[in-house]
Amino acid sequence: SVAGQAIGPDGCPVPLTIDLKGVNFDFDKATLRPEAIVILDEAIAILQKYPQLKVEVAGHTDSVGTEEYNQGLSERRATTVHTYLTDKGIDAARLVGPVGFGELRPIDTNDTSEGRARNRRTELNVQN
């Protein structure tokens, strides 16, 4: 195992980030796309396998629009994912947030439409 990495009840390392690549949003939207639901269902399976995991639900936007507007939009995106997880049986006590980071934490350039699309996302970040 890697130093500092949590070990699950089965003796296997616990993922430190639950990869939600594909839980991206259409421009100016906070609704889940069909492909996002598939990915969230996979994340739910991980959360069910590791009941000790706590995760932060973090929403993000691209840089189009005002910073204030994008902050609210990122919060709505995080809330959408948070609600989906709790509706599917994940205890809200295991979820930090929902938290919105607006346009402050891009993972790609905001200079291209492809980069902006990747920045319109929600992440689950393991907290323990």
Regions found by a protein language model. Give the residues of each.
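Periplasmic peptidoglycan-binding/tethering modules of Gram-negative envelope proteins
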Residues: 1-55, 87-91, 128
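Periplasmic OmpA-like peptidoglycan-binding domain that tethers envelope proteins to the cell wall
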Residues: 34-37, 58-128
